[in-house]
């Protein structure tokens, strides 16, 4: 794995944690966080995940098809094997943490933010069916974070089917078509476009094919700059990506497209291997690697970790503050480590 890809994964999950941070930050910090989020709103960290997902989707799919062809395996069997492999990668974490949230919600006796048992059951079922993005619009709940995993699997299935049976050219043309279309029109309506922003994944596909015509050494040479400029460029891109949704808030279709473009530039710079998004210093690099390698487990478990801390504090009538914030981070780290070691790779 390219070190800088790990760096991008770490940046992406930190951006997601920041946007959800109001759940766990001490009450006396919340006004400052709200003011900060009026300009810097970081759900766009998901765009980095999506662009990377698209890039590695087509990378792994082409390699998988080539290996299967050499073994004389048919298209349908190859497709099924590929999709099952992807499902095994995503499912264990989703099923485990969604089940924990479901049980916890039922035991909470319908106290906010938990919904009544019927709604909770609907949310749980849509989550384990990987259709969460189609139900978030009806009732908000703590299953909401799974919309992105659902969308990713949906796109993987559809894109893989199109690629296997209609070929590379059709897949590229359709990718470019939807990238263009979704600059002006998106599914889900004005309030829920974020639930169907699959064009970010398609940007990753296009990057893969563009780089087929450029050698790694040439790519590195093109983007080679001094440490000073690497620092300026990388920080600027993170800041711009964090501010796009607010700056272009009146254009809910365009702002997501701009976010995807910026995330694509970041992925391109990372693939060049010039050190834009990775600090290779002792302890810092280990921290980056830990966060990146566990980013999926962190994504699936962080909300439950934080709500568990809040429920415990509420039950014992403790006052939330710096202590609850630190405890929330520690519990999240512990749950993420357990999830990474014993759940995420369970079916591999």
Regions found by a protein language model. Name each.
Residues 153-180, 209-230:
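Solvent-exposed interhelical
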Residues 3-66, 91-94, 131, 200-201, ...:
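Functionally critical transmembrane alpha-helices in membrane proteins and complexes, commonly lining
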């Amino acid at each position: 794995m390219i070190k800088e890809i790990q760096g991008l994964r770490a940046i992406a999950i930190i951006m997601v944690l920041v946007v959800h941070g109001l759940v766990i930050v001490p009450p006396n910090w919340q006004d400052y966080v709200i003011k900060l989020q009026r300009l810097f709103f970081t759900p766009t960290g998901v765009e980095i995940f999506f662009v990377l997902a698209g890039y590695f989707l087509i990378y792994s799919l082409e390699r998988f098809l080539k290996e299967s062809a050499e073994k004389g395996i048919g298209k349908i069997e190859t497709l099924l094997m590929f999709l099952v492999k992807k499902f095994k990668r995503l499912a264990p974490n989703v099923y485990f943490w969604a089940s924990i949230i479901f049980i916890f919600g039922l035991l909470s006796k319908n106290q906010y933010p938990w919904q009544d048992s019927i709604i909770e059951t609907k949310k749980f079922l849509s989550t384990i069916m990987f259709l969460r993005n189609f139900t978030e619009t009806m009732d908000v709940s703590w299953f909401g974070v799974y919309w992105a995993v659902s969308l990713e699997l949906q796109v993987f299935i559809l894109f893989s089917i199109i690629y296997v049976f209609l070929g590379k050219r059709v897949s590229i043309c359709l990718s470019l078509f939807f990238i263009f279309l979704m600059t002006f029109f998106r599914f889900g309506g004005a309030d829920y476009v974020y639930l169907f922003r699959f064009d970010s994944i398609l940007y990753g596909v296009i990057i893969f094919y563009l780089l087929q015509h450029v050698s790694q050494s040439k790519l590195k040479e093109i983007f080679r700059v001094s440490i000073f400029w690497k620092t300026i460029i990388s920080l600027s891109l993170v800041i711009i990506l964090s501010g796009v949704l607010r700056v272009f808030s009146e254009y809910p279709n365009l702002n997501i497209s701009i976010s995807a473009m910026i995330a694509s530039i970041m992925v391109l710079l990372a693939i060049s291997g010039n050190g834009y998004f990775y600090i290779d210093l002792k302890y810092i690099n280990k921290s980056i690697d830990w966060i990146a390698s566990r980013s999926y487990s962190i994504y699936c478990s962080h909300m439950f970790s934080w709500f568990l801390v809040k429920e415990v504090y509420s039950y014992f009538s403790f006052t939330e503050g710096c202590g609850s914030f630190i405890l929330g981070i520690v519990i999240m780290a512990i749950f993420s480590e357990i999830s990474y070691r014993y759940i995420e790779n369970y079916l591999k």
